Amino acid sequence: MKKVTIIDYGLSNLLSVQHAFAHFGAETLVTGKAEDVLAADALVLPGVGAFKDGMAGLEKLGLIELIRQKAAAGTPLLGICLGMQMLFDESEEFGLHKGLGLIPGRVVRIPSTDVQGRPQKVPHISWDPLNPAGGRTDFLSLIHISEP
């Protein structure tokens, strides 16, 4: 089984992410070291906090270009919460900030009403299904998926 490298840039609930992958039998490495990211079979970019701070953490560790290179080379990359947001071009959170640019688009605030004008809870916090775009399952194939 391939090793899942969980990127530690200072703003993540690393233990929960590591335990989730371990539950399915995946071997994991939690690291903020460039050499470990370079050698990774698959990457997870978790995160909790503000977009600007997350990008600053990656920059401080010298990981921004490395993550872009790994993604361009086809290394599976999963962003969780803030990590997913940082995959986009930019975010409007607390000003306009550049992201990793791996997904075209801008992260914007969730509207406080739905399309019918009904109030909706913000922030949206829940467990939602993971649906890979275009039916891709390359990242999910690294771990065993089972229904509860």
Give residue spans per PLM region.
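Extreme N-terminal starter segment of soluble prokaryotic enzymes
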Residues: 1-5
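Divalent-cation-assisted or electrostatically stabilized phosphate/pyrophosphate-binding catalytic cores
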Residues: 17
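Generic structural signal for residues in well-ordered beta-strands
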Residues: 27-28, 107
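Short acidic low-complexity segments
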Residues: 28-39
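Short, Asp-centered acidic motifs that coordinate Mg2+ and/or phosphate
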Residues: 42
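Cysteine-nucleophile active-site neighborhood
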Residues: 49-126
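Residue-level detector of conserved catalytic or cofactor/ligand-binding positions
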Residues: 140-148
